Amino acid sequence: MIINHNMSAMFAQRTLGHTNVQVGKGIEKLSSGYRINRAGDDASGLAVSEKMRSQIRGLNQASTNASNGVNFIQVTEAYLQETTDIMQRIRELAIQAANGIYSAEDRMQIQVEVSQLVAEVDRIASSAQFNGMNLLTGRFSRTEGENVIGGSMWFHIGANMDQRMRVYIGTMTAVALGVRNGVDESIMSIETADSANKSIGTIDAALKRINKQRADLGGYQNRMEYTVVGLDIAAENLQAAESRIRDANIAKQMVEYTKNQVLTQSGTAMLAQANTSAQSILSILR
């Protein structure tokens, strides 16, 4: 028997200290819900988890971007619907004016309505905006000649660099549609039967241009809607994977915490017992 070093007490103290650390970690995990709260808990797991979190947040933002893109396209298409309706009405008037039963005075009255409708086409083009950006005045159109790109709208629809989509919207002013002269600003004339007849072809070309643009917008919108679904699924799956790495299994952690609490209580009792065992040596010295 020795009295200078109480090995039992030293062992009990060391074990109790380790158990107390584990109890503290258990409280931390149970209160936060995370298995990994700092790099020391799992260095590689933390690194992987943080990379996944970056991707998840990027995917969620990209989904929002794509949804904004759908809204952008829907607003543009709504303005083009108005322009289409106006052009259809102008076409009706041109066909009416091309009929030989009308006098010059009659055609002048028809021309008044046509002039007002053409002015409305320009008003729509100038007032069609999304977040302060003009949509139909050529800001997002291709520049003709030598296949040079003039402008476009970019939508970032991915979590990483260069994962984006380009959208083009042509110029839809009266000049671009051919119903107003770009030099002298004169409006397409239907004051004679022949001029009204020629105007029908001009309007058909304008409607073809508008319909082509609307078809393009429909394609853009469908793509973006599928993109939103894909991004949401990707974010959901990646979140599940990240959760398996970082989140705590509460049932498992509770079992571990309860075990460590019992060990703490028993360790405390055994440390007290080990400290008192040395006193039994005094009976030998009496």
UniProtKB/Swiss-Prot annotation:
Changing N237A: Peptide of residues 229-247 no longer binds FliW. GO terms for cellular component: periplasmic flagellum. It is found in: Periplasmic flagellum; Periplasm. Its main location: periplasm. Residues 231-286 are annotated as: Required for interaction with FliW. It comes from the Bacteria. Keywords: Bacterial flagellum, Periplasm. InterPro entries: Flagellin, Flagellin_C, Flagellin_C_sub2, Flagellin_N. GO terms for molecular function: structural molecule activity. The flagellum consists of an outer layer composed of repeating units of FlaA around a core that contains several antigenically related polypeptides. Interacts via its C-terminus with FliW; a synthetic peptide of residues 229-247 partially blocks binding to FliW. Component of the core of the flagella. Belongs to the bacterial flagellin family. This is Flagellin FlaB1.
